[in-house]
Amino acid sequence: MKRKSTDRKYGKEFFLFLAIMMLTFGVVLRGQNFSQLKSTLIRMKPVYVGAALFLSVFFVAAEGCMICFLLRSVGIIVHVRECVGYSFAGFFFSGITPSASGGQPMQLYYMKRDGIPLPEGTAVLMAVATAYKFVLAVVGMMILLFWQKLLKEHLGGYFFWYIVGLSLNVLLVILLLFVMLRPVLIRHLAEKIIVMAQKCGMKIPKEKWLEKLDGFLDGYRGTVLFFREHKEKILILIVMTFVQRSSAFLLTFLVYLGFGLSGTAMYQILLLQAAIYVAVDMLPVPGAQGITEAMYGKVFLPVFSGQYLVPAMCVTRGVGFYLMLVIGALWVLKIHYKKIGSGRKKACTNA
């Protein structure tokens, strides 16, 4: 029954994702000359199309390699191919759910189904998620400290959203650190907040909320133990995460070169793409659709001048997000098809 409820939940979120996607496509392509758009896309050099595809696959697969690396660190032997599959599944469910909230639970579901113990799987996924948020927060802070003028010049009115996105990421990292290092304090504060809310007339089931919080804190307690016992592995994880994130920032520069453009330094394009990621990462919109395209159009207008802006956006988002989403969906369908097939085979055998 719980599984059916989860399927319905993800089904609704998928249809919401499709609705936002169609709206985004409509806004981006409105008023475009499609024959000119097609001819511009065709002119992109094949070697850079291939490089962009490689980077996009690398971005998702790198997370799978990190999961595999950490699982093996705790003595769980798992194939890299399986972990890359978990990563693509996570990418798909993160892409279709608000604030990317659906990815990690589904990754944990598939890992548990494959026989990976829940405590170890939870600790590994939380370590990967924490490293990701930490790296993004550090990158965002560095950009703000050293390239604020460039940011304000290119982001314009979207600079506000950059500050919001960066602030949310930094606050989340601080919260995660408190959760890992001071869980008793977090529980005490949460209990006080619930009591205050109840006094204000809000009907909050205190015991139920605290039970959920305890489960959340227990998960991070395992992550703390993992951090303490594998300090050198965590340093490697942070370096791997930085390389992974940088590959996503580099994608736009490859598209820039693919159209034969020049005049803008590589570091500027990387910084601007990183700024977009920081701004939209925490927004409660599936796949950060709409706001990502809007920011891309504003930020990269001086870079992809004239007829190249929309084609560049189509390639960057198409290859870096939508194509990877399709691959993730195919992996999920394959796994579920195998499960149904094995279930029928087992039923026939029992009969």
Residue ranges and their predicted role:
Residues 81-90, 267-278, 307-318:
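Alpha-helical transmembrane segments of multi-pass membrane proteins
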Residues 35-43, 111, 216-228:
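A short amphipathic helical element positioned immediately N-terminal to and/or at the very start
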Residues 211-260:
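Alpha-helical transmembrane segments and their immediate interhelical loop/hinge regions
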Residues 188-228:
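Membrane-interface interhelical connector segments
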Residues 54, 58, 89, 127-134, ...:
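Hydrophobic residues within alpha-helical transmembrane segments
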